[in-house]
From Swiss-Prot:
Protein name: 3-isopropylmalate dehydratase small subunit
Organism name: Bacillus licheniformis (strain ATCC 14580 / DSM 13 / JCM 2505 / CCUG 7422 / NBRC 12200 / NCIMB 9375 / NCTC 10341 / NRRL NRS-1264 / Gibson 46)
Gene: leuD
Entry EC no(s): 4.2.1.33
Catalysed reaction equations from the record: (2R,3S)-3-isopropylmalate = (2S)-2-isopropylmalate
Keyword Kinase (UniProt): no
Pfam families reported for this sequence: Aconitase_C (PF00694)
Keyword tags: Amino-acid biosynthesis, Branched-chain amino acid biosynthesis, Leucine biosynthesis, Lyase
Family the UniProt entry places it in: Belongs to the LeuD family. LeuD type 1 subfamily.
One GO cellular component, as annotated: 3-isopropylmalate dehydratase complex
GO MF terms, alphabetically ordered: 3-isopropylmalate dehydratase activity
Amino acid sequence: MEPLKTHNGIAAVLNRINVDTDQIIPKQFLKRIERTGYGRFAFFDWRYLDNGDPNPDFELNRPEYKGASILIAGENFGCGSSREHAPWALDDYGFKIIIAPSFADIFHQNCFKNGMLPIRLPYEAWKELAEQYEYQSLTMTVDLEKQTITDHAGRQIAFEVDPHWKEMLLNGYDEISLTLLLEEEIEQFEKQRSSWLQA
């Protein structure tokens, strides 16, 4: 994975509560095993009309949000069934950062595991950001090292992140690469394990 340290991009607002993983990536698109190519299916039922044309009433179809890489989402984002395809779809769509008052726990972890940064903010701080960026084409900067969000006017908001996940993102580690870093320790442990554990 690519390291994520500082990111600047357009922020799009999807102010809907309880957006579940089936709304993020509908089940009919889960048959593929590749991690790429899901972006065109993200929010499919909201994003397109029955005839396949873009839905002009869907928030993320607004021209102001073209090229957005930061998503300001509503409460309990990513709830519902556990499907890793949800962060795959969001990442392939172009989102690197998701900011919300709350996330479903499994979805929250899956974002980190797939190189995305989910940021929980207190409701009032989140609400202020959502109101600023709604229907606007404005950028913000997220600094993971300093754990700050800097809005388009230069105002900063601090956020918390688990040190383990922070290290993973800063270094571009996934679970496999992190395990490989511990290869020597794992081999030492296997050599020292009790004989009754050996076949």
